[in-house]
């Protein structure tokens, strides 16, 4: 009987699917790298979300591991090259949390433009800051979307009713343009200079270098906003903090960080930054969908 380790918290739908398929399953979350190394030789399959880092050391110890499933889209917490060297299959669930992530990106946009977190905090304290809070409307603005996969496409559809111009930076858009007449393809520099809101929904660069740095902020409108619900190393956090403090841009909303869990970060306490703890994909609905998808994929692989 195949055996699978679920090492991150997720919907119990995954466990039920494995059990239904007569696959032994252990749910052991919050383990350290060393703790995983001790037990991983027992397992044919492994399921993670974003907390577990599937390192080379873990893979070297995984003498029986055949498949690793990521309940989510990105696989940057898995050492994919090493897994391939060992003929281990790496699976993910693209699209499973796209709607949740796009909705959160939209929520971040609205929060930073309307200063909702500040309004909420001060009102709870009995401070009536009405005269000091003036928001910005979406209508007639330009939204720039970097990356046009499942999340980027969904976000573009969510904002259709706001009478916005939508610019997209995506290598693959030209071949799909007829399917998305409401957007316009743009090069990176034009997009960031023309957009009122720049929202990132792309992979990190292969070399690990940030896509947005001080030089880019200098090209942006001083009234513009940056949204990142993709990957933490896409934007240079120090440069972003400096850009906010120097007035190069008006604000930012960030859900992902260069180091997570983010116990300390240069953006903390910056009043122009709205920050959330990597929760874009964290909805009841998305957690069920990705758990179901990854469990079915791994079951099919191990049983066929």
Language model regions located:
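An N-terminal-biased, well-structured beta-alpha scaffold segment characteristic
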Residues: 1-91, 191-193, 213-219
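Phosphate-binding beta-alpha-beta segment of Rossmann-like dinucleotide-binding domains, i.e.
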Residues: 86-88, 93-142, 154-157, 161, ...
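Rossmann-like dinucleotide-binding domain for NAD(H)/NADP(H)
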Residues: 90-91, 165, 223-304
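Short glycine-/small-residue-rich Rossmann-like dinucleotide-binding loops
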Residues: 51, 73, 196, 201-204, ...
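N-terminal Rossmann-fold cofactor-binding loop
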Residues: 8, 29-30, 168-172, 230
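Rossmann-like dinucleotide/phosphate-binding beta-alpha-beta segment
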Residues: 131-222
